């Protein structure tokens, strides 16, 4: 059994070395609006200097998974794929306009709140999240894009004013 574990461990080490860093330029994001959408989820609209829907295809000739907007609600700035932000908002990024040089996107956000004991509060528990937002001027967000064989790509930070976010939350 230990020989099998050694082989598996060696294979993991080999595969870990297989991931490449994508040659995608850093994308600057600019918030254009933040409002409650038709599905009653809070929706961020923003522009990007990189076409987030086709970044890996444009720069690496590789397919990618759907981009995700991730916002840290508890001042946790570790956006790496090896780490999960316990109190966050995230949503799939969809294209609204792909006119160059600024592509426009939106993301309907779902709010997650994992307590210190590991249990999850109800999704979109705004009453638990509102006090965290009130203590901050802005909420940092990044778009993450993944593709097979590549390290996750992250955009530059988008700051959403916390007042704007709390103002759109249902009471």
Go through the PLM ranges and name each one:
Residues 1-7:
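Bacterial N-terminal signal peptides that target proteins for export
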Residues 9-12:
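Hydrophobic helical h-region of N-terminal Sec-dependent signal peptides
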Residues 19-171:
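Non-catalytic macromolecular-recognition regions in eukaryotic signaling proteins
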């Amino acid at each position: 059994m230990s020989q099998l574990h050694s082989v598996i461990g060696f294979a993991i080490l080999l595969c870990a070395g297989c991931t490449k860093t994508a040659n995608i330029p850093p994308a600057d994001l600019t918030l254009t609006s933040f409002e409650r959408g038709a599905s009653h989820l809070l929706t961020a609209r923003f522009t990007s200097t990189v076409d987030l829907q086709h970044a890996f295809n444009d720069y690496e000739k590789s397919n990618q998974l759907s981009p995700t907007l991730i916002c840290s609600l508890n001042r946790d700035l570790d956006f790496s794929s090896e780490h999960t932000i316990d109190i966050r908002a995230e949503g799939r990024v969809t294209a609204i306009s792909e006119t160059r040089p600024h592509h426009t996107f939106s993301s309907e956000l779902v709010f997650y709140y994992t307590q210190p004991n590991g249990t999850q509060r109800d999704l979109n528990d705004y009453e638990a999240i509102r006090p965290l937002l009130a203590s901050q001027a802005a909420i940092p967000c990044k778009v993450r894009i993944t593709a097979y064989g590549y390290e996750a790509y992250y955009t530059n930070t988008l700051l959403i004013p916390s007042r704007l976010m709390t103002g759109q939350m249902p009471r």
